[in-house]
Regions:
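FAD-binding core of flavoproteins
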Residues: 2-130
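Alpha-helical interface subdomain recognition
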Residues: 7-8, 33, 95, 99, ...
């Protein structure tokens, strides 16, 4: 943990084989060795290590620099993080002992990921709202800034009103994760589900406020939405 905190090492995460196993992919762990393929491993661009899981929820750590570990970058519309396919050919792994004894370790890891993605979406939505408000203050039409028109005001107000409760939802989900274990999974799922829906609405409204410019790469709204 100290090395992670000091940025000496960094991790990519690939748990999709446990969440939604595929017939043409998967990891087989045999003692301290593992073979197979893990798809949609996130944050692999600068990772020195990867946390991977098999279909049973057993997690292991592999080193990106090992010769038996092959990284294949995947093409994605999401430019905020790198997605990879990790191919293991009898690679050395460190199995997380707790994960082989109980499903609690993989469950908590997945729930933590849900909460972090929800928080990520809240931040992206706030950026889109801020950009929309600033644009509405500057863009002029019919001799007036468009922010003075009631329809534009309504869109900005609706985005802000829908997003504000999401801060509390994410905060409560994070609180439950450590302090209310019986509600942790429900709140993790609820926060990710609700914030995702609100974020889609914010992206749509933000694009409407920007008009045709909202569809261009110049303003970058699509970056935050994706």
């Amino acid at each position: 943990l100290n090395k992670i905190a000091s940025n000496e090492i960094s991790f990519g995460v690939g748990l999709t084989e446990y969440i939604a196993a595929r017939e043409d992919a998967g990891i087989e762990i045999d003692g301290s060795k593992a073979s197979g393929r893990a798809l949609f491993v996130i944050d692999g661009d600068h990772a020195s290590h990867f946390v991977l899981a098999d279909k049973n929820g057993v997690m292991c750590i592999v080193r990106a620099e090992d010769a038996e570990v092959e990284l294949v970058k995947l093409t994605s519309v999401d430019k905020t993080r790198g997605y990879f396919e990790i191919v293991l050919n009898n690679a050395d792994v460190d199995v997380l002992e707790n994960s082989s004894q109980s499903a609690e370790a993989i469950t908590k890891t997945v729930d933590a990921g849900r909460i972090m993605l929800a928080a990520d979406s809240v931040g992206a939505s706030q950026v889109m709202i801020d950009k929309s408000v600033e644009y509405a203050k500057e863009r002029k039409q019919f001799g007036r800034v468009i922010g003075s028109f009631q329809a534009v005001k309504h869109m900005c107000a609706e985005m802000a009103a829908e997003l504000e409760p999401c801060y509390a939802i994410v905060w409560h989900a994070a609180h439950c994760f450590n302090n209310v274990p019986e509600e942790a999974r429900l709140m993790a799922c609820q926060s990710k589900s609700h914030v995702s829906e609100v974020s889609k609405m914010v992206a749509k409204k933000a694009t409407e406020v920007h008009g045709g410019m909202g569809f261009t790469d110049l303003l970058g709204l699509h970056y935050w939405f994706k």
